Amino acid sequence: VHWTAEEKALINAYWGKVDVGSVGGETLANLLVVYPWTQRFFEDFGNLSTPSAILNNPKXXXXXXXVITSFGDALKNLDNVXXXXXKLSEYHCNKLHVDPVNFRLLGDVLITLSAANFGKXXXXXXXXXXXXLVGVVAHALARRYH
């Protein structure tokens, strides 16, 4: 993807509004609740039997912070997201064996929660650029699967 200067500015402004500490845990928790089959990748996290258990699970919160931080790291290298996510792609493909469609699902949950948290301050142009970014990051993470 070739990002325009305007898209880069929109993405960085959008991400600057994201409360990583809050949205990170919520994003993974919502993914695990709404798409329960994704829980199989987190069996070593312990109790994921209810939404409350997932939200209060310290391992889920730590993994979510790492995931959201990695997403933020991709923003620092928008012109080469595939290279920035190469190690994560290899790890998810070769060690975790995560179904790559889950990367897109996680990104969609992140966009939904962010928009809900932004309220009226969420602009359609920024949400469209963030949705394109989620697709680029999901593709970069799934790259080692091909």
UniProtKB/Swiss-Prot annotation:
A GO cellular component annotation in the UniProt record: haptoglobin-hemoglobin complex
Role summary: Involved in oxygen transport from the lung to the various peripheral tissues.
A Pfam family reported for this protein in Swiss-Prot or TrEMBL: Globin
Name of protein: Hemoglobin subunit beta-1
GO terms assigned for molecular function: haptoglobin binding; heme binding; metal ion binding; organic acid binding; oxygen binding; oxygen carrier activity; peroxidase activity
Binding site for heme b: H92
Matching InterPro entries: Globin, Globin-like_sf, Globin/Proto, Hemoglobin_b, Hemoglobin_oxygen_transport
Subunit and interaction comment: Heterotetramer of two alpha chains and two beta chains.
Lineage: Eukaryota, Metazoa, Chordata, Craniata, Vertebrata
One BP term from GO: hydrogen peroxide catabolic process
Family: Belongs to the globin family.
Keyword Transport: yes
Organ and tissue specificity: Red blood cells.
Occurrences of domain Globin (ranges): 2-146
Ribosomal protein recorded as keyword: no
Keywords of the record: Heme, Iron, Metal-binding, Oxygen transport, Transport
